[in-house]
A protein has these predicted regions:
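Terminal amphipathic alpha-helical/low-complexity segments used for targeting or macromolecular assembly
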Residues: 1-77, 184-187
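Residue-level signal for functionally critical sites in structured catalytic/ligand-binding pockets
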Residues: 5-9, 18, 22-27, 40, ...
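Generic serine detector
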Residues: 13, 21, 29, 33-35, ...
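Left-handed beta-helix
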Residues: 77, 83-84, 88-95, 100-102, ...
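Conserved beta-strand-loop-alpha-helix hinge in the C-terminal portion
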Residues: 165-186
Length: 187
C-alpha cells in the first residue's frame, strides 16, 4: 500500500522516470496494459523491478521517501540489488544479485544476473544509452562505455568501449561492430 502511495505522492520527474522503467520491464516480459497504476502494480510483483523502484524513490520528494521508510519498517525490503548513481529511465535488472553503481548511465541500461558495475578508488564508470551488461560481467573504474554496446557474459571491462560495439573476454575486447537492428533484437 505504501509503495503505491509513495508513487502517487512522488514528483512528476520521478514518476516519468519510473514510467520509463515500467515500460521497459513490461516490454521485456511481453505484457501490455494501458493503465499506469495497473502497469506499476504488475512490475512491483517482480523482485527485480521492485529494487529499481526503491532506487528511484530515493531521489523523490520527502513525502514519497517517508512513505517508503514506513513500508520498510512494516515489511523490510528484500533487496538483492544495490543501485547507486545517476541512471536515466528504462533501467532493466534482469535478475537479482547485481551491483549497479555507475557515476552516470543513459537510457535503457540492462543488467544481467551477477553483473557488477563499480568504482576503482574514486573513479566510477560512465555508461551511455542502450547498453546491455550480460551475466557476471564486471565494469570497473573510470571507464566510458559508449552508446549501443553489448558486454558479453563474464567479461571484465577496464578500458573505454566505443559506440556500437560487442565486447567479450577478460580483459574485454571488441569482437564486432553492431547496427541498430542487431541491437534491438537483443535489448
Amino acid at each position: 500500500m505504501f509503495k503505491l502511495l509513495a508513487y502517487i505522492m512522488a514528483d512528476e520527474n520521478t514518476k516519468r522516470i519510473i514510467g520509463e522503467d515500467v515500460d521497459r520491464n513490461l516490454k521485456w516480459d511481453h505484457i501490455n496494459s494501458d493503465s499506469r497504476i495497473k502497469r506499476l502494480i504488475l512490475c512491483l510483483k517482480k523482485n527485480d523491478y521492485r529494487n529499481v523502484y526503491y532506487f528511484r524513490l530515493k531521489n523523490a520528494n520527502k513525502v514519497a521517501r517517508a512513505l517508503i521508510k514506513i513500508e520498510n519498517i512494516i515489511k523490510p525490503f528484500d533487496t538483492t540489488v544495490e543501485i547507486v548513481g545517476n541512471i536515466k529511465g528504462g533501467l532493466l535488472v534482469s535478475h537479482c544479485l547485481s551491483m549497479v553503481g555507475p557515476s552516470e548511465a543513459g537510457k535503457n541500461l540492462r543488467v544481467g544476473p551477477g553483473a557488477v558495475i563499480g568504482r576503482m578508488g574514486m573513479d566510477f564508470p560512465v555508461i551511455g544509452d542502450n547498453v546491455y551488461i550480460a551475466a557476471n560481467a564486471t565494469v570497473i573504474g573510470g571507464v566510458h562505455i559508449g552508446n549501443n554496446v553489448i558486454i558479453g557474459a563474464g567479461s571484465v571491462v577496464v578500458k573505454d568501449i566505443p559506440d556500437n560495439s560487442v565486447v567479450v573476454g577478460n580483459p574485454a575486447r571488441i569482437i564486432r561492430t553492431i547496427n541498430e537492428s542487431d541491437y534491438n533484437e537483443i535489448m
